[in-house]
Design a protein with these regions (language model features):
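Alpha-helical transmembrane segments of multi-pass integral membrane proteins
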Residues: 32, 37, 189-255
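Interfacial segments of alpha-helical transmembrane regions
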Residues: 90-109, 177-192
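Transmembrane alpha-helical insertion/packing segments
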Residues: 3-69, 222, 231
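Membrane-interfacial, low-structure loops and terminal tails that flank and connect transmembrane helices
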Residues: 2-28, 91-92, 174-187, 245-255
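Hydrophobic alpha-helical transmembrane segments
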Residues: 139-164
Length: 255
């Protein structure tokens, strides 16, 4: 009996054997998956140390600072990718794949909307008095009201990034099946390790900052958010590429 030819990890394919994706980013693409995390660290630390007044005046301000604009643009790009996936027949035929794309789209929409207070930072409308009573920054957003709208989803995201962005990629060389089983489509690639590592390191810096220790960067929580949002965007980029690879394989003649 001729052994079955390994196919790509497709949640719709209940039986293996499976083979790893070949579209995941490698070293030729390090300019973005490694370059951006390094750029964020160099910019945050360098500007805080060399030009603290400039960093405070132009990078950190709510609504129009460089970092705030980046925090709006990154999830907006993620929203475009995730929303496009929702209309693909391949995705709609796979409930789990559709669910992940939908969660990605909703998450990116929420983040982008919240970062700009759903347009308040663009159009400068006044916050209704009843909403100002519950919003600690007098803005028309949810994340400055109750913990369930900010701390809870952020904690879940941080845990997910630690496990998916560090634990799984570092374990994969010792457990190759992680890249070649039915659900491998959903696991972050090794290319996301630098972003996850940046989020963890600046989280430690933020804890020191909260403890009253002098740190290398002002408001490290803003840098953490940059890493968190970029992780989502990078994950969606790879997720879309893997789906494209699956689509191509599905349309290829079987040998």
């Amino acid at each position: 009996m001729t052994p079955m030819r390994p196919h790509l990890p497709d949640p719709k394919q209940a039986e293996g054997p499976y083979r790893p994706f070949t579209s995941d980013p490698g070293w030729p693409e390090a300019w973005w998956w490694l370059g951006f995390p390094l750029l964020v660290a160099v910019f945050s630390i360098g500007a805080s140390q060399i030009a603290p007044d400039w960093y405070r005046s132009y990078a950190l301000p709510e609504g129009y600072g460089i970092i705030e604009v980046v925090h709006f643009v990154i999830p907006l790009l993620g929203l475009l990718i995730a929303a496009r996936l929702l209309f693909l027949p391949f995705v709609r035929a796979r409930p789990m794949v559709f669910a992940v794309a939908a969660i990605g789209a909703v998450s990116c929409l929420y983040i982008a909307g919240e970062e700009m207070s759903w347009g308040q930072h663009f159009f400068h409308w006044n916050t209704p008095e009843y909403w100002a009573l519950v919003n600690r920054q007098d803005e028309t957003n949810l994340h400055n009201t109750y913990a369930i709208f900010e701390k809870t989803p952020r904690s879940l995201l941080e845990i997910g990034i630690f496990i998916g962005g560090l634990v799984i990629p570092l374990a994969a060389p010792f457990a190759p099946w992680l890249r070649a089983f039915r659900m491998s489509l959903f696991l972050p690639p090794a290319a996301l390790v630098p972003t996850a590592l940046g989020a963890v390191l600046f989280k430690l810096i933020d804890r020191l900052h909260q403890g009253g220790y002098s740190t290398l960067v002002m408001r490290p929580s803003e840098t953490i958010e940059t890493y968190l949002y970029f992780f989502i965007l990078a994950y969606l980029i790879v997720f879309a590429r893997r789906i494209k690879e699956l689509e191509a394989a599905e349309g290829a003649p079987q040998k």
